[in-house]
């Protein structure tokens, strides 16, 4: 008698608990956007020698400025669309000691006119 209860209870418990993972994709998840949305158009406006104020006007406030490295700004954008894989885009902007733009790196290509005079 005790054995029959286990034969019924065990598959029932496994089926109910396993059903949670099968229904998870059906649960609605909101889209989550975090950080600085960076467009290639804005990156194309950056020029060698721009001041920090000019870069901030074009790109907006950086997501991160490390206290030990104030001449390196990080623009980070992270987007999660429901159950799909997350997307992350990074742009790192470097300034010299005078606060002028010297280099940039990340997921956005530098424009051909980056080294042209302002």
From Swiss-Prot:
**Signal peptide (residue range):** 1-19
Single GO cellular component annotation?
Answer: Bam protein complex
Cite the GO molecular-function annotations of the record: protein-macromolecule adaptor activity
Say which family it is in. Belongs to the BamE family.
Q: Which organism is it from?
A: Aliivibrio fischeri (strain ATCC 700601 / ES114)
Q: Where is the lipid attached (N-palmitoyl cysteine)?
A: 20
**What biological-process terms (Gene Ontology) are attached?**
Gram-negative-bacterium-type cell outer membrane assembly; protein insertion into membrane
Q: What is the lineage of its organism?
A: Bacteria, Pseudomonadati, Pseudomonadota, Gammaproteobacteria, Vibrionales
For this UniProt entry, what is the primary localization, expressed as one broad class? membrane
What functional role does this protein have? Part of the outer membrane protein assembly complex, which is involved in assembly and insertion of beta-barrel proteins into the outer membrane.
Report the record's disulfide bonds.
none
Q: What is this protein called?
A: Outer membrane protein assembly factor BamE
> Highest taxon of the source?
Bacteria
Topology versus the membrane, per the UniProt entry?
Lipid-anchor
């Amino acid at each position: 008698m005790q054995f029959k209860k286990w034969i019924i209870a065990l598959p029932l418990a496994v089926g109910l608990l396993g059903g949670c993972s099968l229904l998870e994709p059906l649960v609605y998840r909101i889209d989550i956007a975090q950080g600085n949305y960076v467009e290639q158009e804005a990156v194309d406006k950056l020029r060698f020698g721009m001041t920090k104020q000019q870069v901030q006007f074009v790109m907006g406030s950086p997501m991160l400025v490390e206290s030990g490295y104030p001449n390196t700004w990080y623009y980070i954008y992270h987007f999660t669309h429901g159950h799909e894989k997350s997307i992350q885009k990074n742009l790192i902007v470097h300034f010299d000691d005078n606060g002028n733009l010297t280099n940039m790196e990340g997921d956005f290509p530098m424009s051909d006119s980056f080294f042209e005079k302002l």
